């Protein structure tokens, strides 16, 4: 599969469940983390080839393609709240992070053994019994150097940084210890800028999103209060460079938008900080980005 993707000009990333480290002191399993990575790419509008293997390991495998996801479920939200992530270093003052990818378990698949566009649970994607997801093959463009695991690591580090974290930048809009829901996805900067310019109000903020230099591809982390996620109205967002090398960490940061403030870095800036900041007149919420996937109602 990866060879075919390479021949079509992609730079495929292959993820195998056995390569994921165990989570100490956590109820999150390897399967959960692999599903999160799948969700980030699907939320980015990128189709993912899925390889399934037998749970017992004594039967042949199977493959399919995932192209979408189902709706968030309240039962999964309750579980996600219990699985929220807290930085050990800042455990006494951190804002717990809830991963919105944990709100979903249903995915739209194309499988030669099923009618097209079936919505199946991640734990039962195949019609064959006792099959589990073991690997993912993701067709990234050659200039997308920062993949989902590295982007997640960078965002987590930024959210808990002593200079750039939530405790500093969101202290005026969050209560002490308030949980934050994060939504991660990749987008083209052109589409992202156009969406922000169309959906935000205010001349200054529209102009800033239009003029801020960005690479062709970006990772976006939208930040939500728990009660605002269902309506996809974020209080803030972080944008990092999807074409950046993984070892650049905070130097891949492009933009942070919080109530009444936008800060961004120039492309030639080496240090992990901001060269430009702009104060906004209002603290309007940010509409969640909706251009990667189309919502389809099944009748």
Across the structure, where does each feature detected by a protein language model lie?
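Conserved active-site-adjacent core of cysteine acyl-enzyme catalytic domains
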Residues: 1-121, 217, 223-298
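A broad detector of the eukaryotic-type serine/threonine protein kinase catalytic domain
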Residues: 181, 193, 220-221, 241
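Catalytic-core signature of thiol
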Residues: 1-26, 142-145, 149-208, 212, ...
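Conserved catalytic-core surface of thiol
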Residues: 86-191
């Amino acid at each position: 599969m990866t060879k075919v993707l390479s021949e079509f000009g992609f730079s495929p990333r292959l993820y195998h469940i056995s390569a994921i480290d165990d989570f100490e002191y956590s109820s999150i399993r390897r399967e959960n983390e692999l599903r999160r990575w799948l969700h980030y790419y699907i939320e980015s509008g990128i189709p993912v080839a899925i390889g399934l293997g037998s749970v017992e390991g004594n039967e042949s495998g199977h493959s399919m393609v995932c192209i979408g996801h189902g709706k968030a479920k309240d039962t999964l939200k309750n579980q996600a709240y219990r699985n929220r992530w807290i930085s050990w270093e800042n455990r006494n003052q951190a804002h717990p992070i809830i991963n919105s990818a944990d709100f979903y378990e249903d995915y739209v698949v194309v499988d030669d053994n099923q009618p097209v566009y079936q919505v199946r649970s991640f734990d039962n994607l195949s019609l064959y019994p006792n099959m589990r997801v073991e690997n993912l093959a993701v067709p990234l463009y050659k200039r997308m150097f920062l993949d989902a695991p590295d982007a997640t690591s960078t965002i987590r580090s930024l959210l808990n940084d002593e200079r750039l974290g939530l405790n500093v930048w969101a202290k005026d809009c969050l209560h002490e210890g308030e949980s934050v829901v994060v939504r991660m996805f990749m987008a083209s900067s052109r589409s992202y800028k156009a969406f922000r310019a169309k959906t935000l109000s205010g001349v200054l903020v529209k102009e800033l999103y239009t003029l801020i230099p960005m690479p062709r591809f970006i990772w976006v982390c939208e930040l939500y209060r728990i009660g605002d996620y269902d309506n996809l109205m974020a209080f803030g967002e972080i944008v990092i460079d999807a074409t950046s090398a993984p070892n650049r960490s905070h130097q891949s940061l492009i933009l942070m938008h919080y109530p009444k403030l936008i800060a961004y870095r120039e492309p030639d800036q080496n240090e992990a900080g901001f060269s430009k900041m702009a104060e906004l007149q209002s603290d309007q919420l940010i509409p969640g980005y909706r251009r990667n996937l189309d919502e389809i109602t099944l009748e």
